[in-house]
Amino acid sequence: MAAATGTRKKKTPRPGQWKLWLLYTAGFVPAVWTFYLGATGQLGADPVKTFEHLLGLWALRFLILTLLVTPMRDLTGITLLRYRRALGLLAFYYALMHFTTYMVLDQGLNLSAIITDIVRRPFITIGMISLALLVPLALTSNNWSIRKLGRRWSSLHKLVYIAIAGSAVHFLMSVKSWPAEPVIYAAIVAALLLWRLARPYLRTRKPALRPRGEAIALRK
């Protein structure tokens, strides 16, 4: 007799799925640690500002790591494409926490104070625009959106370049003087964006290195 139909196949976890969950877990460690420092009074004289700053800094760091995936593959042959989505989402989560801290803890959801602050300090507007650009990218960072949007998905996700540029400018403008830290981050972002612009020309002149682990399908 034929085997009974209608039995559902059990979904088996994709190879390396545990590495993604490990990345997410490790990615949230800085947020948990910073919250712990704030809760125990170890964030200095202005804990809210320090908490807000550190969350924003980690958002920028994860954006940089997201953009580093492609040059690393081009220059070394090491491919980390399967982790790029997770890095991008971590950047968005930290940017959202940074924004929430500003709105709730810093400004106390006082709309008039927020508007006054935006007018007085334009870098806040730049930061909010950068976050707004990340929202559609986070919402479409899934396989269903890739299938539905087709080629438009790639075009949409190019907004990340504007978002990371805005984030670097936001950081630079948020300090009264230009200490080394924001300048270094801005220089890294500028280098990554220049690499992206020059990449099509570099690829025509030099064959790309064969990525390690190329046999593993990258498209999900």
Swiss-Prot record:
Annotated GO biological process: protein repair
Keyword Lipid metabolism: no
Entries under InterPro entries matching the protein: Fe3_Rdtase_TM_dom (IPR013130), MsrQ-like (IPR022837)
Gene Ontology MF: a single term: heme binding
Keyword Metal-binding found: yes
Subcellular location, record wording: Cell inner membrane
Described purpose of this protein according to its UniProt entry: Part of the MsrPQ system that repairs oxidized periplasmic proteins containing methionine sulfoxide residues (Met-O), using respiratory chain electrons. Thus protects these proteins from oxidative-stress damage caused by reactive species of oxygen and chlorine generated by the host defense mechanisms. MsrPQ is essential for the maintenance of envelope integrity under bleach stress, rescuing a wide series of structurally unrelated periplasmic proteins from methionine oxidation.
Membership in a protein family: Belongs to the MsrQ family.
Protein's name in the database: Protein-methionine-sulfoxide reductase heme-binding subunit MsrQ
Organism: Brucella melitensis biotype 2 (strain ATCC 23457)
Lineage, opening ranks: Bacteria, Pseudomonadati, Pseudomonadota, Alphaproteobacteria, Hyphomicrobiales
